[in-house]
Amino acid sequence: YSGGVPPTGIAQPPGRTPGSAGASTSETIKSAPAPSKDCPGCTAARESLTLGALAARQTNRRTSACAGALRYSASWADRLPADVPLYPGARVTEAAGANTGACALRAVSFSTNARLQTVVDWYYTRVTNTGFTAEHQSDGTQHTLGGTRDRDGGAYVLFLTPRRD
């Protein structure tokens, strides 16, 4: 399948500032804390060519052990947990997942026309409102937002890179 790439602001509602799509929800958006400068996950993301390679490099053994079980299909983007959903208006570029006995893993790569800080703040709001911790890291170019939740052992990590266009 191939087709033309639509203009970046094609889904932008009238009167909205370009790059702010997805910022309006029923939640009050909280500002994520400033990132720490230590970002080992940023290097892993930059050096990984696939979602499976990135999963294999995670420090969490449960996640890295499941990397080999990942299967690629766009349908995995529809199976993200409700507490860590796909960003509104996101354009999925790659999706993978595993749902076996010991592995419940989802990985999705997407792009959006929203500013990086808007996306970080939106996810920070979503995850902290549902009981996850949130640690924001950056190496100056790449950002990560990751955390865990005690009540169910859930974990997430987001790797974010600003677009150059």
Annotate each language-model stretch with its function.
Residues Y1-D165:
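An acidic-aromatic pocket/loop used at catalytic or ligand-binding sites
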